[in-house]
A protein has these predicted regions:
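Domain-edge interaction signal
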Residues: 1-140
Length: 140
């Protein structure tokens, strides 16, 4: 898993004690703790304007496997970068970027798997708008 995920989990579970992380056999379960109301105040202050969009995304991906969620996030970021850079975009270019320019772990998924997930993203409306900063890909 991404280092960023571990950092986030550390903040919400160990530092702030908002959530307890229960590692299951094939999944991770997040248990809300009494201190969670403090997080809710933080969320409302910074993210309440995006609440409907966030809930929509959660509804779409909540039953995805970790691998599929990773693929969606990676494809979204790559696709968004193409939009920001105003480059010509195609499904093949996005998948090629992910498999060749991102972390080598992305190669564990076959090209057709990436293309299937990208197709599904379009069907459910997970389409980037070219907002934010370009993705910074760290050296391996």
């Amino acid at each position: 898993l991404s280092e960023a995920i571990y950092k986030c989990e550390s903040v919400i579970s160990k530092k702030n004690r908002w959530v307890k992380i229960n590692n299951k056999k094939n999944s991770i379960e997040y248990e809300i703790l009494p201190n969670f109301s403090n997080y809710n105040k933080y969320y409302n202050k910074y993210y309440s304007d995006y609440d409907k969009k966030i809930e929509r995304i959660i509804k779409i991906i909540k039953d995805y496997s970790m691998d599929k969620a990773e693929m969606v996030a990676t494809l979204y970021a790559s696709w968004n970068d193409f939009i920001i850079k105003e480059e010509e975009i195609s499904d093949i270019k996005i998948v090629k970027d992910v498999r060749e320019n991102w972390n080598d772990t992305k190669k564990r998924f076959k090209e057709n798997e990436w293309l299937d997930v990208l197709k599904e993203m379009k069907q459910v409306g997970l389409i980037p708008k070219g907002k934010g900063n370009l993705t910074i890909i760290k050296e391996q």
